[in-house]
């Protein structure tokens, strides 16, 4: 898979350095995966959730941080729409819904 917005990970790590190892590992696994559907993602990351509208939510560092992505399976693109702490994600999810990010 190709992560189109890898810069977002680097910027998030600058503000949350404790996430560096976990986000680098997540990025490495994603880049070396070839997903065709949600079942493929689930085999790679058991804690991922499909929230609709091609959006998927990954829990990072024991659910302390969340990544919301859009995945285009046919062209193997992963587009990061949101990275934040769990409370930030919950606020945003209440306001607009994860499937609208």
Where are these regions (language model features)?
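Basic, Lys/Arg-enriched alpha-helical interface segments
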Residues: 1-64, 73-79, 86-101
